[in-house]
Amino acid sequence: MIDVRYRNRLGNRMFQYCLGRILAEELDFALQADALPGFPNTRQKIEGLSLEEPEQLLSGQKIDWDEVRADRSHRRIVLDGWFQRYEYYRPWRREIRQWLAIDPAVQAPEIKPGVVVHVRRTDYVQMRWALPFSYYDEALETLLPHGGPVWIVTDDSHDPFLRHFSKWKPKIFRGSPLETMLFMSRSSKLVLSQSTFGWWPAFLGDVESVACPLPQSGIWSAATEFPGIDLIERDRFICLPCTDYRPTRLESAHQLKRQVHRRLVEIAIRSLNLPLVLQPP
């Protein structure tokens, strides 16, 4: 049996589900994994060998991928990690696009020609994983040398950082996480942040050109505190080195205001004994 223990939010869980299903398919094991909301094919029951023990625990990012698949012994494999390495998934891209086909009830427009830019802010600013505008500007100049429509997907449409994009006259796309992911996957050109949420549309869609950061710090950097992550497809992406982001005073003030507001909302919700749901896409 393959037992998937989900961690964190949607983009991360998609890796965990797919790794579990790949192993189930290759080893002829049963798959135990909750369905991912909005992805109806993840409700499919995967039959196979189902044992409770002996147990093999896989965690972290990088695992001995070849050895795990070559071991045909009967066992229960528990997936309790992140597994964010494109080498595990790219050979299965055709199948994964079927497994993670978004519910047809979810709708989003197609923007062609033009480019969709994923600007991840909020928690990334606090963790120093946000990217500088110089990266986005270079990416847009590279993908749109003669100009064209620009759409921004972001988790904070009020962030003054977005004013840097004014010369591109961008439009802001607003939608649910699934609508946003579908919208990004339908673009012809895509600018990534160092985020799993943005990586998946580039993998699942038919995006012609993808600009990708090579950051000095953050989860996709060589200096990451989470070693083993490797989602940068250097043979497919246009990879652009970028410096660390340094917020302006206005941007810092905005982030402080956000944090104070969020804290007040949390206090109010807890005082009313309501469930706390504060998850930016």
Regions found by a protein language model. Give the residues of each.
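A short, glycine/small-residue-rich beta-strand->loop->alpha-helix junction that serves as a flexible
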Residues: 6-15, 126-129
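Donor-binding and catalytic core of enzymes assembling or modifying cell-surface/extracellular glycoconjugates
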Residues: 10, 144-228
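Short amphipathic alpha-helix
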Residues: 16-23
